[in-house]
Structures are given as structure tokens and as C-alpha cells.
């Protein structure tokens, strides 16, 4: 069974008051760079970006990280990706602090973790 980590980029970046709002694209790029070198047990990491953050990282695969540009809101894309992965019988973990989104992805079979957990994993 493969394991997939889906990252709510906006939520993770927004969890730390480090000035991300001044450069959303740069903040997304920094998160992507950290995910690329992360030593995790996940077979695939899906980074979902929306709005201005999409300008920081090209959509597509880079090693074990797949960056997805949400065409609308990131939440709908995250739920869609979680459902697709669960349907492939993957073990799915979604990183977000958004309670409503957590409920939605748990409804399609994913487990959830908060941004603090991921940031601790990234060191």
C-alpha cells in the first residue's frame, strides 16, 4: 500500500507569522523546497497551492513531490486528491488546520494532521 501526504499549502504557510503575506509565492517556494529534502515515510507528497502562491512553484512532479495548482479554492482540490488516493487504496494523510476541510477529507477516508506536526517533521 502506498502512502500519500497531501499538504494544504495555504494553511501550512499561514500557520506561522513569518511575513508570508508579503510574498505568498516565495513562502510557497520555501515550503516546496523543505518538502523536497524532507526525510519522511511517505511515498508521495502532494502540495496544493492556490491564488498568488501558485506563482512560486510550477505545477508538476519534482522528485517525490507533486505540486498541484488549484483552479478554484484549494479545499475542493484537496478533497478531490484525497478521494482519488483513497480510491487507489493508498494510505492518505492531509495536513491542514481547517476543521471543515478535515471533516470533508476524513469523510473520504483520509486521516488528518495539523500544520505544526508537518513543520516539526520538516525540522
Model-derived features: positions:
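Nuclease catalytic cores that cleave nucleic-acid phosphodiester bonds
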Residues: 2-6, 10-123
Amino acid at each position: 500500500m502506498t502512502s500519500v501526504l497531501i499538504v494544504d499549502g495555504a494553511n501550512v504557510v499561514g500557520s506561522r507569522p513569518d511575513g508570508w503575506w508579503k510574498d505568498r509565492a516565495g513562502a510557497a517556494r520555501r515550503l516546496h523546497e523543505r518538502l523536497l529534502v524532507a526525510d519522511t515515510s511517505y511515498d508521495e507528497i502532494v502540495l496544493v497551492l492556490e491564488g498568488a502562491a501558485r506563482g512560486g512553484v510550477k505545477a508538476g512532479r519534482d522528485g517525490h513531490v507533486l505540486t498541484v495548482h488549484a483552479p478554484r479554492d484549494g479545499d475542493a482540490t484537496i478533497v478531490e486528491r484525497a478521494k482519488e488516493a483513497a480510491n487507489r487504496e493508498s494510505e492518505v494523510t492531509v495536513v491542514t488546520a481547517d476543521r471543515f476541510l478535515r471533516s470533508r477529507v476524513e469523510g473520504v477516508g483520509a486521516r488528518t494532521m495539523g500544520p505544526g506536526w508537518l513543520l516539526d517533521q520538516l525540522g
